[in-house]
Regions:
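Hydrophobic anchor at the beta1->P-loop junction of P-loop NTPases
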Residues: 4
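Hydrophobic positions on the alpha1 helix immediately C-terminal to the Walker A/P-loop
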Residues: 15, 19
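Short glycine-rich substrate-engagement loop in P-loop NTPases that contacts/grips substrate
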Residues: 35-66
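Structural recognition of the conserved hydrophobic beta-strand(s) that form the central parallel beta-sheet
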Residues: 71, 109-115
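Conserved Walker B catalytic segment
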Residues: 76-111
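Interdomain motor-coupling "hinge/lid" segment immediately C-terminal to the ATP-binding subdomain
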Residues: 115, 122-228
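Accessory nucleic acid-recognition modules appended to NTPase machines
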Residues: 178, 182-358
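Domain-level recognition of nuclease-like catalytic cores that cleave nucleotide substrates
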Residues: 397-424
Length: 424
């Protein structure tokens, strides 16, 4: 079984019911071998009963000589019902029971999608443990966005620069590409938060009286992407800026809600030399920068932080496990009395990206043309003594090159449009 997860409105249903279905048809699978069941449609409400769901699917896949592909959309609409064979009224039968039974059929390839409105995707995934494979769908990458942008653009020769500007502002939620005006795009992204994401969390987690706190917390995190923070710092910010007392434990819980809904990713710091993790502080990145910008009413679009967020998302998309790197060094200085003092300094590496036996240390900067900026950006990289790749990604349009220390310099477009760029 495959469980299709991801941020709401990022294209999970389109992936199954259009792209994958067309792929199957083009490769010889007949229509009768594809069973589509969107449970959010009124015509299918009887199948929200897990017993009816089980009976219906089995009736559609009855020929053992054929391979069937079953797509169940919005599985969370399948309700809990009493177990008629037990006297205990608290004993319930759920879609989990139905799906686990269907998984035992050898002629069935089962795909389910789940929306956050009643059950968060990660909660469903936990229910199946190792019995289901996750297909995680993300908003459009810049490479995907660029392909669509130049196809749909009214301009004869759209530029990558124009696409980058648009992507940095409105992000990669697929529906954005069908909207013409900046006002329409802005309104769509704001409504996603108001009518979909926040509403989902408030209803699912039963925090109706805390919606204002959730909104303020999102705004605080939005304004601090790429910056170190933790619940204790945010607790102080609530008190100083909003005169609202919210405990750090409550803040930590609400941040987890946003992570469970795939809105935010929490990224820990990793001590490169000590090979250990720091529990706090950490950084947060948005699954989509357009959503982040919408939270701040498009007022605080700092390209360096936006670029950092986009790089993080692309590394995750490519299958890397990503941490923020810390390089601890010792320096010695003489004070005014002539006494030598030892100082312990922690330098930061924007990203430590791991995938199997590969590792890359990555810094992000708008430009390193200024010598002082250049020295600052590579200081931590030069202090790392292992042989893994060290990379600086800049916004400037540069030709890929390596310096005398073996540090690779790439433009942001080379990195985003070429998945092999890190190995140049």
């Amino acid at each position: 079984m495959k469980i299709v997860t991801g941020l709401r409105r990022c294209g999970k249903s389109f992936l199954l019911f259009h792209l994958y279905k067309n792929y199957l048809l083009e490769n010889g699978v007949s229509e009768e071998q594809i069973v589509e069941l969107p449970l959010d449609e009124i015509d299918n409400i009887r199948y929200r009963n897990p017993f009816e769901l089980n009976t219906y699917i089995k009736s559609r896949v009855s020929d053992p000589t054929k391979r069937y592909y079953v797509f169940i959309d919005e599985i969370q609409f399948c309700a809990e019902v009493p177990n008629p064979y037990l006297d205990d009224s608290s004993a319930k039968v759920t879609f989990i029971d139905a799906v686990l039974g269907l998984m035992k059929l050898n002629n069935l390839d089962l795909y389910i999608t789940v929306s956050n409105s009643q059950m968060l995707s990660r909660e469903v995934l936990t229910q199946f443990r190792d019995r289901g494979d996750e297909i995680h769908v993300l908003p459009l990458s810049f490479a995907e966005f660029w392909d669509a942008f130049r196809t749909l653009s009214a301009t004869a020769s759209p530029s990558v620069t124009d696409a980058w500007r648009e992507y940095c502002t409105f992000g990669g939620m697929p529906y954005i590409l069908s909207l013409d005006s900046p006002e329409g795009k802005s309104r769509y992204l704001k409504n996603l938060f108001k009518e979909t994401y926040l509403k989902d969390i408030v209803e699912r987690k039963d925090v109706r009286n805390e919606r204002e706190v959730l909104e303020i917390l999102l705004d605080f995190v939005s304004s601090a992407i790429g910056s170190l923070t933790n619940p204790a710092k945010l607790e102080k910010r609530f008190l100083s800026e909003k005169k609202i007392k919210v405990s750090h434990n409550t803040i930590a819980k609400y941040l987890d809600y946003f992570s469970e809904a795939y809105i935010l990713d929490a990224v820990k710091r990793y001590d490169v030399k000590g090979a250990k993790y720091f529990s706090t502080p950490l950084k947060y990145y948005f699954a989509d920068v357009g959503l982040r910008n919408a939270r701040l009413n498009f007022r605080q679009i700092e390209e360096n932080h936006i670029m950092e967020n986009i790089i993080y998302n692309d590394l995750v998309r490519r299958g890397f496990n990503v941490d923020v790197g810390v390089v601890s060094i010792s320096t010695r200085e003489w004070d005014v009395r002539g006494i030598q003092k030892k100082n312990n300094v922690r330098l930061e590496v924007d990203f430590v990206a791991n995938k199997g036996s590969r590792r890359y240390y990555i810094q992000a900067a708008l430009s390193v043309a200024d010598p002082e900026t250049h020295a600052r950006e590579i200081r931590s990289l030069r202090r790392i003594e292992d042989s893994f790749g060290k990379i600086v990604i800049v916004k400037d349009d540069i030709v890929p090159r390596q310096d005398k220390d073996g540090i690779l310099y790439l433009s942001i477009t080379d990195f985003l449009l070429n998945e092999q760029a890190l190995t140049i």
